[in-house]
Amino acid sequence: MRVYVNGIGLIAPGLNGWAASVPILAGSADYIAGPLTIPVLEILPPAERRRTPTVVKLAIAAGCEALANAGQAAAKIATVFTSSGGDGDVIHQICETLTEPEREVSPTRFHNSVHNAPAGYWGIATGAHEPSTSLCAYDASFAAGLIEAATQVSIDGHSVLLVAYDAPYPE
């Protein structure tokens, strides 16, 4: 099996994009801790931008950067989204709501709680109609996503965008 990486997107605290992160990751520049800075996602319609949770914005921004660095269009590429636990903030908010007497869970929070929410927002943002897979394998999520993407490339012979994303859980 032969696969290769055609483009990378990277967004993390103190690492604002792949090009800016390479010297830090290579050890030729010092890492300076900083806040997580997610670019404004003009690719999403305004209504979707307002209700999109941070972890989904993170996934979409990283995917957009990877495709831009690869010189590929989003609408014609299959995707694999992988996360160790999905959107912990949304799940935490839902669990807190369920402890209240009214137990009225926001429909927006509920639809953002599913593990394939980033894939759905990706489709809305890019108009993509290609297959999408959403995975969760806890600490092995990146490896599971890489295996899934490589398998799709090997079997189907087309490019696949792998988006691995995570955000800290609430305290």
Describe each model-derived feature in a short phrase.
Residues 1-134, 157, 164-171:
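Conserved "HGTGT" condensation-loop signature of ketosynthase/thiolase-family condensing enzymes
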Residues 150-151:
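A generic local secondary-structure boundary/capping motif
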